[in-house]
Amino acid sequence: MFTYNSRGELVGDQLRPGGRFGYQYDNIGNRKEAFEFGSTTDYETDELNRYAGIVRNGGEAFTPQYDADGNQTLVKTSTGIWEVTYNAENRPVKFESEDGGTTVECAYDSMGRRFEKKVTVGGTTGFHARYLYRDYLQVAECDLTGETPEVVRSYIWDPSEPEATRVLSMTRWEANGTQEKEHLYCMDDAMKNVTSLFGEARGRRALYEYRPYGGLITSEGNMGEENGFRFSSEYMDGELGLVYHSVHRYQFV
């Protein structure tokens, strides 16, 4: 059950017994406090309405950093602290972990769509993908780690909602995209969040539950990690703990 204040801001959510969420804001909508599963996070803002300090359960404060354009260049997510580099169009092109061991690089086309992502851990490329689009909907993913690109996944979207739509199914491919490995079908809620994946013969393959602003509470099943489309039917970058929005860039959860 969601509760809102007079300005339409979310102030409470009773997900389940013991699963209460609460939020407080200042007069212009900046979050001041978050209460989630018994944990309290306090936020401090600067004169430009940017978060200047974040303290969890009274511990050490994390201080975000920004460039001259207001892009956040030092971020803290569920996977750690990342230093972010942006291109001239203010799109994030490189994420480097605090210890320098992991680098995530992104490339964009002339329409601002991310068409490539490369993850390097300890100097070794562990993930390298190219994304294919129909307008702003990702319809296929190619693996670039081998000598030749191979189609590994394709997606079907709800045609009744051409813009703010939801993913309906995923096909996994093998033999360089010439043979279907399996079809997986998505179940979603009223907010377009993918809540589960089902196979044709093997039952439920993934189950997800979310916090009010997109953080994962539950991720179960042998396809729980491989499936990228989760909160709001947007792509989850598991390495970064961030949701990639094709139009709105990254949402910090």
Segments (PLM) and residue ranges:
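Extracellular/periplasmic catalytic domains that process cell-envelope and extracellular macromolecules
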Residues: 125, 132, 148-149, 159-163, ...
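Asp/Glu-centered strand-loop micro-motifs enriched in Gly/Pro and often flanked by an aromatic residue
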Residues: 59, 76, 96-98, 120, ...
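A contiguous, low-structure linker/loop signature
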Residues: 136, 142-155
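Glycine-centered tight beta-turn/hairpin loop motif at sheet-sheet or coil-to-beta transitions
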Residues: 16-18, 36-38, 57-59, 77-79, ...
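A short glycine-rich beta-turn/N-cap micro-motif
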Residues: 1-12, 19, 24-34, 45-53, ...
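Short beta-turn/strand-loop junction motif enriched in small, turn-promoting residues
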Residues: 71, 80, 120-122, 172-175, ...
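A motif-centric feature for acidic-aromatic and gly/ser/thr-rich catalytic loops and repeats
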Residues: 33, 37, 41-45, 174-247
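Short loop/turn microsegments at loop-to-beta-strand junctions
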Residues: 1, 20-21, 39-41, 60-62, ...
